[in-house]
Structure formats: structure tokens, C-alpha cells
Amino acid sequence: FEVIVKSDNVCLAFLYKGINTMDSMVGYKNDKYLYFGRCAAKLDDVANFIPARITGLVMIAAAYFVNLDAKRGWKTFCRDRYTHVSPNSAMTESVAAGALNIQLGGGHFYFGKWVHKDTIGDDIRPVKAEDIVTTNNLLYMTAILSLILFALIYLLRIFPVV
């Protein structure tokens, strides 16, 4: 029986967490951390490239299971998944916006300066406070389906179907 936790996997997990933490701390654009922050942000983009896309696809299935508009989630994902400065951020944001029939994003103040950003999703209905609970349910179902998906992949590695 294969041991699940190997030392190289643990090292990769620590490396990933370090990259993610660096991006959170200094990955934004300002004069003080411009180059160091840019390096952290690019490393984070590379580390999350595949996981962001897998999560977006799993979230579309999750939208179906929590009775949201999975079809619109798919359409919005296909159209708006690159509508963000980060190559990964809009992957799940576009699915959530489409599944909830709302529009997200747009301009905002960032460190006291107005920053223009494109919107994600369609302005079909106004955003409501209850959308937070609905989005949390979408998040939980996405996590459950991801766990099932990767457990099945792991089991197929242990017990290959020939």
C-alpha cells in the first residue's frame, strides 16, 4: 500500500504555500515592491494555472447540484474567463457570476486611486445579500465534487482498471 504523504509532496506543498503567501503580501503593484511583487505574482500565476481551470470546470458541475444556472455559468466561463488582469482569477469568478445571473467586477478604488476593470457576467438582476450564502453553497459543493474527483483519480492509481 502506497504511503499518501511523501517528503517530496510535502516540500511541494510548502513551496506552493510560500509562493501563495508571497503573492498575498507583496504581489500588488506599488513602487516599494514593484519587481519583487511582480515575481511573486508571476510565480503564483504559474502555480495556479492548471488548478484554476480545473476548479472552474468543477464549479460548473457544482452549480447544477445546488440548483443554479449551470448553463449560463458555462457560457459566462467561456466568454469572460480571461476578463481579468490575472490569468487565473476570472476562471471561477466568471462561473459564479453566470450561475447567479449577476455581474461582478468593474472599477473600484485601489490604494486611493480609481482603477478601471472590466465587468464579469451579465447584469441580469441586482446583487442581493443572500447571494453570499448561495455563493458559499456553490463553494462547498465545488469542494465536495473536487474531493470526489481527486479521490477517484487516486483510487484508479491504486486499483487500475485494465
Label each PLM-derived region with a short phrase.
Residues F1-M22, G27-V162:
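Hydrophobic alpha-helical transmembrane segments
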